[in-house]
A protein has these predicted regions:
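Short, basic, alpha-helical segments at the C-terminal edge of helix-turn-helix-like DNA-binding modules
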Residues: 62-69
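Basic, helix-initiating cap at the start of DNA-binding domains
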Residues: 1-38, 54-58, 79
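Helix-loop "lid/cap" segments that line or gate small-molecule binding pockets
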Residues: 77, 89-100, 106-116, 189-196
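C-terminal peripheral helix-coil segments that are non-catalytic and often amphipathic
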Residues: 90, 130, 134, 138-146, ...
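Amphipathic alpha-helical packing segments from all-alpha helical-bundle domains
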Residues: 69, 97-106, 115-146, 155-160
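Short hydrophobic/aromatic patch on the recognition helix
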Residues: 39-50
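Hydrophobic alpha-helical connector segments
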Residues: 59, 72-102, 158-159, 185
Length: 201
């Protein structure tokens, strides 16, 4: 007698199930059985779509990285509107949302996953952080070109500070409430204060 339910879009439903397990139980609880149990499907479904569990995790990470790239487009589109600090505050809350923050420990602690990600794409070993870095760097360069931050602002250093500090702000416990706009906004404002103060005219 068959076990589980039929999945119409099996890959996406397995990804969704994995994200729920990560958010509820943390990265140590993420196993192939936990994913298929959460999805309510037979245990063999995952292995019909992926060579092994690490192959599943690679596609899960790359799917999340692609979503971050989409959000990055919205950040770049905001250049020249609102405030630089406000745009970056919103972006950090999105780029380091609960799911990306739950996935990052998988990349950090699973050597095989990291190795496969490197093979799958350049810089893939640090997927998600790499996409966040690219997004923020491109946005800051756009704002510098528009004269909203100093012409000699060191975009690379600002980006590293924002990504590194933003990551730490959201790392404490990704299953708990996020640090909230005030804390993130205060951090962002402090990082970019000099570059904004010295902007042209």
């Amino acid at each position: 007698m068959p076990t589980g339910v039929h999945l119409r879009d099996a890959r996406q439903q397995l990804f969704d199930a994995a994200e729920r397990v990560l958010l509820r139980d943390g990265p140590n609880a993420l196993t192939s059985r936990a994913v298929t149990d959460e999805a309510g499907c037979a245990k063999g479904v995952l292995h019909r779509h992926f060579a092994d569990f690490d192959a599943f995790l690679v596609d899960l990470v790359l799917d999340q990285a692609a979503q971050i790239e989409t959000r990055a487009s919205a950040l770049r589109a905001s250049a020249g509107t609102g405030t630089v600090a406000g745009n970056l505050t919103s972006a950090l809350a999105t780029l380091f949302g609960p799911v990306p923050m739950a996935i990052l420990p998988l990349i950090t602690f699973r050597d095989e996953l990291r190795a496969r990600l490197r093979r799958a794409r350049p810089g893939g070993g640090m997927a998600i952080l790499a996409e966040a870095t690219t997004a923020i760097s491109a946005y800051l360069a756009d704002e510098r070109d528009r004269g909203r931050i100093a012409a000699d602002a060191d975009v690379d250093s600002l980006t590293l500070s924002l990504v590194g500090g933003g990551h730490l702000l959201f790392t404490d416990d990704f299953t708990a409430d996020d640090p909230g706009p005030p804390a993130v906004g205060t951090f962002v404002t402090a990082v970019i204060a000099d570059a904004v103060r010295r902007r042209p005219g």
